[in-house]
Amino acid sequence: MDYSKTLNLPQTQFPMRGNLPQREPETQKYWQEIDLYKKVQEKNKGKTKFILHDGPPYANGHIHLGHTLNKVLKDIIVKYRSMSGYDAPYVPGWDTHGLPIEQQAIKQLGINRHQVNPVEFRAKCKDYALKWANTQSEEFQRLGVRGDWENPYYTLLPQYEATQIRVFGEMAKKGYIYKGLKPVYWCASCETALAEAEVEYADKTSPSIYVKFPVKDGKGVLPQDAAVVIWTTTPWTLPANVAISVHPEFEYVLAAVQNQKIVVAKELLESFKQAVGAEEAEILATYQGEQLERVVCQHPFIDERESLVILGEHVTLDAGTGAVHTAPGHGEEDFMVGKKYELPVLAPIDNRGRFTSEGGKFQGQFIMDANKTIIEELKERDALMGHVSIKHQYPHCWRCKQPIFFRATEQWFASVDGFRQEALQAIRNVKWVPSWGEDRIYNMVEGRGDWCVSRQRTWGVPIPIFYCNDCGKEIITEETISHIEKLFREHGSDIWFAKEANELVPASLTCPHCGKGKDFRKETDTMDVWFDSGSSHLAVLNQPELWPEQQRPADLYLEGSDQHRGWFNSSLSTSVAVTGKPPYKTVLTHGFTVDEKGRKMSKSLGNVVDPLKICSQMGADILRLWVSSADYRADLALSQNILKQMTESYRKIRNTARFLLGNLYDFDPVKDKVAYDKLPELDRVALMELHKLIKQVLAAYENYEFHIVYHAVHNYCVVDLSAFYLDIIKDRLYTAVPGSLERRAAQTVLYEALDALVRLLTPVLAFTTEEIYKYMPVVGDRLASVQMLDMPEVNVEYMDVELEKKWDKIHEIRKEVLKALEVARKNKVIGNALEAKVDLYVAGDVEEVLKPMAAELTTLFIVSKVNLHGLAAAPADAVKAEELELALQVATAEGGKCERCWMYHEEVGNDAEHATLCPRCATVVKEHHTA
């Protein structure tokens, strides 16, 4: 007889190999066909809402690993919430205006934006933005992200733009919007002003020079033959110099250096001496900074210009001379201190970073090139005391990566002072995860200057302001804002560029300033894109005709930690300014993606990992598993090596699921499930371990600690199940009577474990759990998707503290037995564990635990025989456990090997009909497998 046919061996069609690159797109297609998003929304209608508001990625280029991390984290949260009793809609969005799109449109069309019709140009920009938004949408869906992909938000939608105009108008109404001459970050390459959030720092080599400003009028304090020395790394700003700032409380010295009388801060004299290569410096006099106020110096190369010595708290002793070259047109602090002294604001630089006619002999030169010319000029006039090159951190444009500079221009600003205190209070009312985010954004808002909201670009939402051609004053009223809002809602912002000002204003408009003006012109600047995305809390969350399921404030904003100064900040500013409240309840930030050495990913380093390539080679679930595997609050590393580890972890989880499925082929949970009180103790312990896992994982999801979800589930599959419970019950599953209580009890646990694992893993391994769900037995009707199930609940009945204590002890004992078996295997006493007989010598609590379950010990240790003895009877060569009252001996089991269960038994051969079986197997075969 072929006894293998009498075994209940695993049967399942669930494939061992994931083959994810082929299977996942099929699953994705299925989700689209059944309109899964809609189905989930219908199922959860009327439940408590959970709104995760999507920070819009920029509609430019394919998605990268950072996008993957961000979108998968959001998807994990939304899926968890929708399986936990919440109505959790997810509306993806895109940031669709701004410079990079303009640049790409210019590049692809080969045009000059100054020579093209703005309406045509904007149409090209729109096409480009929507093309990439659609591409990214497909790529995000390939990652398994569930959302309202048919109805996303774009910042270029007419309704969105109209709401943005309303936000701007409300801020203007409250007096927060003003026009002013002020130094702003300026990018010559992009020809536009930049907000602080658009600035990044990178190394740059600059000239470091020490320059003499001869004293013209010492005010009875400084001698006429002295010179105040300044230090600068931007020689090109010297043509705009009008003052020298000193700190009122620092000590300054008049010193003889290289046969010249110079003035520098006392504390910096030594470093100055070294910098200019002087051997000696003799101090001739000492002054308090405030004594030098209003001393007049001569500009080093503009003969008709004086430079006034003024006092400034911004002066430091970190480097230089303690006397700071001050050009109010090229620096924020310079501008502030210059205002106090009513100094002129000079900025003789045009949009492209070239000197204008006001720059005199430097006219037409690009500022960075002019450094050289200016240094030559200083040398000729004997005004240069020292010159070296230094490498330092310098602001660059985050778009084009070119160095930028401060330039005073007329710009539109949002006055942060108007709502700063409210914003700071709002920050305290929001939950920040990780908690350090709170202080980070608080300090940023507390210290930030006014927000420059205007940009000199075409592709954006226009600043809705008119100018009266009679009196020249700007006009922004409730009437004009309401009118423009209505026009934009109907036609989009293109209408601003298509029509003249007089066609855009309300027909009845008369200039409110002069009372007679009827002829108008319109503002040509557009809004900062941070104002676009920063208005989404009203433009999306409060736009019921487009997204009725959304509501304000959002429960959660989740982006990279760079958004403390970006989207979190701009959203907070517009929300507090307009509504007095924050736009979000909780803000969660993640780190950035790096390689395994912690380096930023870059093409030049060759360490860029393409998520789409991973999807086509390994599968999106491998990437999703990676996102869940590390603490995303720090930077996340990814490399081929890490991907290999993820694939291995995935394989273990998949194999566990396959084993569970394979042993449930004949199990109907409705008919065959065994009641808890009828389960053997081992099975009750297994259920307790499962429900401890459920409790831990649900708490981790609630706390956004997905790495705990991953490690707990992985550990459960590999250790609690595979290396313990599943190993022990294999004999029962395969050899017992198919419908027996002992087998059905084990299957009950397997079913509960599979059912819980599928639910717990769905937010992470969305594709794989969908596949498992197709094959597993279910109670009632099978739902259209695994994502429509609810999270498992913890059953407190399964939590038995006494049982847990007892089995903790059994685990310790088992560990000692397995160790001894391993030694016996190495010493060739046995081949595998079933060839072993184990003698245990026990006392105390070990005896207490093992004695009542003596009959189950062969199963528990997966050996053929276990004998229990008192510890006192232990022979000298028995192995003693270090921390337990236990000694053990392993020997070869007596008797023959049963052909069916492979255990050794002294009675194998006693049954003539089944001579190769042990009594247990012979009975099962006779009663259930004999024709």
UniProtKB/Swiss-Prot annotation:
Protein family membership: Belongs to the class-I aminoacyl-tRNA synthetase family. IleS type 1 subfamily.
Chain's gene name: ileS
Cellular component GO terms held in the UniProt record: cytosol
Co-factor(s): Zn(2+)
Role description: Catalyzes the attachment of isoleucine to tRNA(Ile). As IleRS can inadvertently accommodate and process structurally similar amino acids such as valine, to avoid such errors it has two additional distinct tRNA(Ile)-dependent editing activities. One activity is designated as 'pretransfer' editing and involves the hydrolysis of activated Val-AMP. The other activity is designated 'posttransfer' editing and involves deacylation of mischarged Val-tRNA(Ile).
Reactions it catalyzes: tRNA(Ile) + L-isoleucine + ATP = L-isoleucyl-tRNA(Ile) + AMP + diphosphate
Catalytic EC class: ligase
Main location: cytoplasm
HAMAP family documented for this protein: Ile_tRNA_synth_type1
GO biological process: isoleucyl-tRNA aminoacylation
The EC number(s) this enzyme carries: 6.1.1.5
Domain notes: IleRS has two distinct active sites: one for aminoacylation and one for editing. The misactivated valine is translocated from the active site to the editing site, which sterically excludes the correctly activated isoleucine. The single editing site contains two valyl binding pockets, one specific for each substrate (Val-AMP or Val-tRNA(Ile)).
Family annotation (InterPro entries): aa-tRNA-synth_I_CS, aa-tRNA-synth_Ia, Anticodon_Ile_BEm, Ile-tRNA-ligase, Ile-tRNA-ligase_type1, Ile-tRNA_ligase, M/V/L/I-tRNA-synth_anticd-bd, Rossmann-like_a/b/a_fold
Compartments, as annotated in UniProt: Cytoplasm
UniProt binding sites for Zn(2+): C898, C901, C918, C921
Protein name listed in UniProt: Isoleucine--tRNA ligase
Region Disordered: start-end pairs: 1-25
Pfam family, one: zf-FPG_IleRS
Oligomeric form and interacting partners: Monomer.
Superkingdom in the source lineage: Bacteria
Molecular function as annotated in GO: aminoacyl-tRNA deacylase activity; ATP binding; isoleucine-tRNA ligase activity; tRNA binding; zinc ion binding
Range of residues in the leader sequence: none
Motif placement: 'HIGH' region: 57-67
Bound cofactor: record note: Binds 1 zinc ion per subunit.
Compositionally biased region (Polar residues): 1-14
Entry binding sites for L-isoleucyl-5'-AMP: E559
